[in-house]
Amino acid sequence: MRISKISRKTKETDIQLEINLDGKGTADVSTGIGFFDHMLSSFARHAEFDLKVRAEGDLYVDEHHLIEDTGIVLGKALAEALGDMAGIARFGEARIPMDEALAEVALDVGGRSYLVMKADFIAPQVGQFSTQLVKHFFETVASNAKITIHASVYGDNDHHKIEALFKAFAYAMKRAVKIEGKEVKSTKGTL
């Protein structure tokens, strides 16, 4: 089974995360940031990954450390659950609308970390979630999962734009990690 359980404890955060890439899309998420819980739950549901997250942090400072460290742990868990990546489709893409917003994500689960994101937000925050942390979260996931992500979104409502991005990421990941055979999808023979 493609499962991972990762913990990370620092002076700023304490995070436990479990993921099953062959799950049913169940989510049990508690970070103390309602909008972030909603985004992670949406990601799990639409990727059809089972995801459990327990995260505490120095929210009295701000949400940066908690969101960043959750991205670190999620990225590491994705990498661990994928193992040697033999048989996976490797590439995934999705276009997801949410009312007036449209998000596009294309990714390569190929062992190389990179993020290109085109996203502008109007408000500084959605709930307790700083909109400037959207890009940083995806950078952190990409870096730790060793995946390349190209993402873009447009629209008028920041909630819709961010949610469409998380859902597009979910569908792209679902497609990229799908088992299609036994071989590694690389001319090098390894990822």
Curated annotation (Swiss-Prot):
PROSITE patterns, alphabetized: IGP_DEHYDRATASE_1, IGP_DEHYDRATASE_2
InterPro entries cross-referenced by the UniProt entry: IGPD_sf, ImidazoleglycerolP_deHydtase, ImidazoleglycerP_deHydtase_CS, Ribosomal_Su5_D2-typ_SF
Domain of life of the source: Archaea
Pathway: Amino-acid biosynthesis; L-histidine biosynthesis; L-histidine from 5-phospho-alpha-D-ribose 1-diphosphate: step 6/9
Cysteine disulfide links: none
GO terms, biological process: L-histidine biosynthetic process
Pfam families: IGPD
NCBIfam families noted in UniProt: PRK00951.2-1, PRK00951.2-4
PANTHER family, A to Z: IMIDAZOLEGLYCEROL-PHOSPHATE DEHYDRATASE (PTHR23133:SF2), IMIDAZOLEGLYCEROL-PHOSPHATE DEHYDRATASE HIS7 (PTHR23133)
Protein name: Imidazoleglycerol-phosphate dehydratase
Species lineage: Archaea, Methanobacteriati, Methanobacteriota, Stenosarchaea group, Methanomicrobia
Protein's gene: hisB
